[in-house]
Regions:
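Double-stranded beta-helix
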Residues: 139-202
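Short helix-to-loop capping/linker segments positioned immediately adjacent to catalytic or ligand/cofactor-binding
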Residues: 74, 118-122, 134-137, 178-184, ...
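Short, charged/polar surface micro-motifs in flexible loops or helix N-caps
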Residues: 82, 106-109, 126-127, 138-141, ...
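Aromatic-acidic/polar surface patches that form glycan- and anion
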Residues: 24, 74-78, 125, 179-188, ...
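Ligand-binding loop in jelly-roll beta-barrel domains
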Residues: 204-210
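Short, conserved beta-strand element in jelly-roll/cupin
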Residues: 115, 122-141, 186-188, 194
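Non-heme Fe(II)-dependent double-stranded beta-helix
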Residues: 1-14, 19-114, 120-122, 161
Length: 210
């Protein structure tokens, strides 16, 4: 799958870019249904993957390393359409470090605070590391699309500090995040959002009924 020049330039200038129509609706619906089934099975044994609503209801939060759990999930993550785009962004042969599926059910959980992926990954050089975020549903502001601090990819990795009561969140100091440069990355089902390992990003609570 060829990468348009303007998308490539947007990625390196702003730190993120959207490529629509990488996967089909049928493919993403199959993966979403499979991930939901696996999460529901795992919820019985692992509270780490569970979110709770205000009324105490439980729903799956995320699935770590899904490519290890089912051949369809492995093929989805390693699909040539995706890997060819990654290779064009980084001008190198891509390797998969890890993958996750975030469920983000409506009215559950909380927003993911601003962070940089390489604040967690510690991979070098940072220009050769990116995240490919595949939309299994239409994603917009209402249901919690990704938000970026544009051009933060050009800066350093900031100190990421643990948050009390949030064992999976490490975040930079708020005064180092320039919210005047925030941009929303809306994407349709089957599209992919790519971002640089230094790009500051967040996603808010799902306020929709989707």
């Amino acid at each position: 799958m060829a990468l348009a020049r303007e998308i490539y330039e947007h990625y390196w200038e702003k730190g993120w870019a959207v490529v629509e129509n990488v996967y089909s609706i049928e493919e993403t619906e199959h993966i979403a249904a499979l991930a939901t089934r696996l999460c529901e099975e795992l919820m019985q044994e692992d509270d780490y993957i569970v979110d709770s609503s205000d009324d105490g209801a439980r729903a799956p939060r995320k699935l770590d390393l899904p490519f290890e759990r089912h051949p369809d999930l492995r093929n989805f993550a390693l699909d040539r359409r995706l890997s060819s785009l990654v290779g064009e962004f980084i001008n190198d042969q891509p390797l998969l470090l890890a993958d996750q599926i975030f469920m983000k059910p409506p009215h559950f959980g909380s927003k993911k605070p601003y962070h940089q992926d390489n604040g967690y990954f510690h991979c070098h050089p940072g220009d050769k590391v990116l995240t490919a975020w595949i939309a299994l549903d239409d994603v917009d502001e209402e249901n919690g699309c990704l938000r970026y601090i544009e051009e933060s990819n050009k800066g350093p990795i900031l100190p990421h500090l643990p948050q009390p009561g949030e064992p999976y969140n490490f975040v930079p100091p708020a005064d180092l995040i320039d919210l005047s440069k925030e941009a929303l990355a809306e994407v349709r089902q089957g599209g992919v959002v790519f971002h640089h390992s230094h790009s500051l990003h967040t996603s808010h609570h799902n306020e929709s009924d989707r």
